[in-house]
């Protein structure tokens, strides 16, 4: 837990230095000086790298450290003797005490962050037992890899997504996240000169998964679309750099195109169905948005045509080089990625066997395009696959796939690429800040993703009940109505604020709510019927009274018994109206 706190503190300090207009090398140099001071001895290059990791959990490429050390030698801060580095003025601790002070200050801040999250969890679920050490570790994982599923992930995301809680604490977390973004930009860096001038010596082809392609046009919601737009801005900026030999190419596999076409074909089959059938068939935002406004199958065909036209306009093109056919060629078997052990590990995490087959095919195709070479910088490996599927991302880090820590992974996230491209193009974090850098926005996306997954599981469970005829027709109708209500809440822009959507028994809660409303409506209908009877009798008495008025204009005669009855009816009428309105308001 202590190393976790140190790393988070160092990230915040990294961002602190960056805000002081220090360039990346100057910031790294400060940490190197602090490392050399603490070691009390001369260090070889590899030892400097090791101590940077031991002291701050910074995994910085050797080439970058070496360049930073050379700059320190030129500025007379460090000397090199027999390939070992040491501080020239080790006694002058004040010059590099800011790191120590900042990290110590953050220990208090870190405690405040954890306590705020614990308080939030207790507020929304008082029965939940929070293990502080587990929460600290999960918070660390959330900052460094928000795609990893952990015990407290949904609570951390809910805390950050909620606009009403601890804005000062969230600002501190944002500072940590910004530091992590800066460090991410240094990952898989071989040529230190590329930190200052972004060079592409050859094309880098980024293959994009179906879900992200849907995000590009807004099928998954406006927030996802905005993040993809940030990605496009950075790609276009890189491609406009003069004298670059290579370009960033955005492509999708023919297999991905087939999946997209099948998706639209499914939408064609759904669009003309009844509303109940649509509820039974639609379980994600993309399908809901494709169906929105569509009445006939031809409307879906038109949307599909417009979608592929949109991709072409953004220069996102199909790669029809028949990579899949090449990977099954016996001459390319060495690039196939598969072992029984990695399959077992994949299935043990609760994943589907069919997904394993699809994912290993993607990994193998990228490996084939790279010709099996994943060492070096990201820009020089030639290809990478972009996805938001956590199961595929985890598989790409399996030890049988990702053999060396320095290897560039075959698959990554759009967040990583945005971080990388933003860093490499030296965008100032205050002038151009991609939406994915905002921890509150990212948290909302994570919460919505968790809610959508819960809804999908709920949908699958209900579908299974339908197929197996496990329940009566009335029960099924009631569950479908409940499912529709939940679906509307899930697709709402503020779904992340609805904590009940996380409940495992959300369907039962919604059904009970519907039943309760039905009973209330029945009661109100009974009241309304009583009012109708009272109004009818009152109307009859009024007519009789008017008749008496006409019969005897000088003297209005109403029998005492009828007058009493009329007064009683007036009272009953007024009292029932009050009860009627009261029940509606309640």
Where are these regions (language model features)?
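Active-site proximal loops enriched in glycine and acidic residues that flank catalytic Cys/His/Asp
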Residues: 387-389
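Gly/serine-rich nucleotide phosphate-binding loop at the start of the catalytic core
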Residues: 41-42
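Hydrophobic, helix-forming membrane-interacting segments
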Residues: 559-586
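Active-site-proximal, substrate-binding regions of enzyme catalytic domains
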Residues: 2-35, 45-47, 51-56, 62-82, ...
């Amino acid at each position: 837990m202590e190393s976790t706190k140190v790393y988070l503190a160092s990230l915040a300090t990294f961002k602190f230095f960056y805000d002081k207009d220090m360039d990346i090398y100057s910031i790294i140099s400060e940490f190197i000086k602090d490392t050399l001071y603490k070691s009390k001895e001369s260090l070889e290059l590899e030892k400097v790298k090791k101590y940077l990791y031991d002291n701050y959990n910074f995994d910085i490429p050797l080439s970058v450290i070496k360049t930073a050390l050379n700059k320190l030698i030129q500025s007379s801060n460090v000397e090199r003797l027999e390939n070992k580095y040491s501080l020239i003025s080790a006694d002058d601790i004040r010059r590099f005490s800011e790191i120590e002070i900042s990290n110590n200050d953050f220990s208090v801040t870190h405690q405040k962050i954890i306590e705020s999250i614990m308080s939030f969890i207790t507020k929304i679920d008082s029965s939940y037992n929070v293990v502080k050490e587990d929460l600290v570790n999960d918070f660390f994982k959330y900052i460094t890899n928000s795609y990893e599923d952990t015990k407290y992930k949904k609570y951390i995301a809910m805390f950050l997504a909620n606009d009403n809680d601890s804005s000062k604490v969230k600002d501190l977390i944002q500072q940590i996240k910004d530091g992590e973004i800066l460090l991410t930009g240094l990952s898989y860096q071989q040529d230190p000169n590329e930190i200052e001038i972004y060079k592409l010596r050859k094309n880098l082809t980024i293959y994009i998964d179906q879900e992200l392609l849907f995000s590009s046009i807004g099928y998954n919601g406006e927030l996802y679309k905005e993040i993809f737009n940030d990605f496009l801005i950075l790609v276009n900026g890189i491609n406009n750099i003069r004298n670059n030999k290579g370009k960033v190419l955005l492509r999708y596999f023919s297999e991905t195109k087939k999946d997209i076409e099948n998706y639209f074909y499914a939408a064609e089959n759904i669009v003309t169905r009844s509303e109940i059938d649509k509820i039974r068939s639609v379980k994600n935002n993309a399908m809901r948005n494709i169906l929105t406004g569509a009445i006939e199958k031809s409307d879906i065909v038109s949307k599909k045509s417009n979608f592929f036209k949109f991709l072409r306009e953004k220069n996102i093109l199909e790669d029809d080089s028949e990579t899949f056919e090449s990977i099954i060629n016996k001459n390319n078997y060495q690039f196939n990625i598969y072992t029984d052990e990695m399959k077992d590990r994949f299935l043990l995490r609760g994943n589907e066997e069919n997904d394993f087959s699809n994912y290993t095919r993607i990994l193998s195709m990228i490996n084939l395009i790279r010709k099996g070479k994943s060492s070096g910088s990201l820009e020089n490996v030639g290809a990478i696959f972009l996805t938001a599927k956590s199961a595929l991302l985890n598989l790409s880090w399996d030890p049988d796939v990702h053999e060396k820590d320095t290897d560039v992974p075959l698959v990554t996230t759009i967040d990583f690429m945005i971080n990388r491209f933003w860093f490499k193009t030296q965008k100032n974090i205050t002038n151009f800040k991609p939406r994915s850098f905002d921890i509150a926005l990212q948290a909302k996306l994570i919460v919505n993703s968790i809610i959508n997954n819960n809804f999908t599981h709920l949908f699958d469970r209900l579908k299974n009940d339908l197929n197996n005829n496990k329940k009566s027709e009335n029960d099924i109708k009631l569950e479908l109505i409940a499912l529709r209500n939940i679906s509307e809440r899930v697709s709402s822009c503020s779904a992340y604020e609805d904590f009940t959507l996380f409940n495992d028994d959300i369907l039962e809660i919604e059904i009970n709510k519907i039943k309760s409303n039905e009973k209330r409506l029945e009661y109100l209908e009974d009241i309304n019927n009583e009012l109708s009877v009272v109004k009818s009798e009152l109307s009859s008495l009024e007519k009789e009274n008017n008749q008496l008025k006409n019969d005897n204009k000088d003297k209005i005669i109403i029998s005492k018994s009828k007058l009493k009855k009329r007064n009683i009816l007036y009272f009953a009428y007024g009292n029932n109206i009050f009860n009627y309105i009261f029940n509606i308001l309640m």
